[in-house]
């Protein structure tokens, strides 16, 4: 029993040391895929963390998610469907920006999606590995964003995407995702990625992380949000 108590005490001290460690820097967290399921969105908004929420247009709960997010004083974004390298993997059908569309078609689809979610402050890409690496397509999308005063975050679903570069050249406020937090649905894996993002922000001064409006992700954030808030990041 004494050995067990000693091990528990050592483990507690180790956890306390991590919690007490002070970090510096800024971490921006974007919650993607809002609109499919409202429950994780509610749970995340109720954490009162300064997350940004990227909402897919035209889904069953898109409007409800927007209402919950804005009602909670959080930042709402459009999660704009864009063409992936493999069209057969395209999840959003006719609302997706395609690289073989004319500039006018791209702008029309982009405006329609933006208008469907009044009050959004910015846009990031859903899928889009092919579209975000196509300069002409990105220029057409970003022209609309510039006209409407919206920022653009390149989700970095493809290492050769140029969305943020094109945005910068056009004077559109922009940034690029640095890390995905929930490629695994295991809560412990997600928590480990959250701390990896915190350390990245501390090391570089800032970082952007993307995760998704899913039950396991919401549960993971619920377990660590107080520690992250207390970490100094």
Identify the function of each model-found stretch.
Residues 65-68, 92, 96, 147-157:
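Short N-terminal helix-initiation segments at or just after the protein's N-terminus
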Residues 231-233:
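Short, intrinsically disordered, charge-balanced linker/junction segments flanking boundaries
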Residues 1-24:
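Terminal interaction modules at protein C-ends
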Residues 58-62, 99-108:
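Glycine-rich anion/phosphate-binding loops
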Residues 26-33, 94-104, 183-189:
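Active-site mouth loops of central-metabolism enzymes
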Residues 23-27, 48-49, 94-96, 124, ...:
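N-terminal start-of-chain detector that recognizes signal peptides
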Residues 103-194, 200-202, 206, 212-229:
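Catalytic domains of cell-wall/extracellular-matrix polysaccharide-remodeling enzymes
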């Amino acid at each position: 029993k004494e050995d067990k108590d000693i091990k528990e005490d050592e483990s507690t001290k180790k956890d306390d040391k991590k919690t007490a460690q002070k970090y510096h820097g800024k971490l921006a967290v974007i919650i993607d895929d809002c609109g499919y399921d409202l429950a994780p969105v509610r749970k995340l908004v109720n954490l009162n963390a300064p997350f940004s929420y990227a909402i897919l247009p035209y889904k069953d709960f898109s409007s409800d998610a927007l209402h919950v997010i804005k009602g909670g004083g959080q930042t709402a974004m459009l999660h704009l469907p864009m063409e992936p390298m493999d069209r057969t993997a395209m999840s959003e059908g006719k609302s997706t920006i395609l690289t073989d569309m004319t500039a006018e078609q791209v702008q029309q689809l982009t405006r329609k999606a933006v208008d469907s979610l009044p009050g959004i402050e910015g846009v990031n890409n859903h899928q889009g590995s092919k579209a975000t690496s196509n300069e002409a397509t990105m220029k057409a999308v970003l022209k609309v964003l510039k006209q409407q005063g919206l920022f653009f975050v390149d989700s970095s679903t493809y290492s050769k995407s140029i969305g943020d570069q094109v945005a910068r050249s056009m004077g559109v406020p922009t940034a690029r995702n640095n890390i995905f937090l929930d490629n695994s649905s295991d809560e412990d894996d997600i928590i480990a990625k959250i701390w990896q993002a915190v350390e990245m922000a501390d090391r570089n001064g800032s970082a952007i992380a993307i995760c998704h409006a899913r039950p396991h992700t919401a549960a993971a954030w619920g377990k660590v949000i107080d520690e992250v808030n207390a970490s100094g990041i």
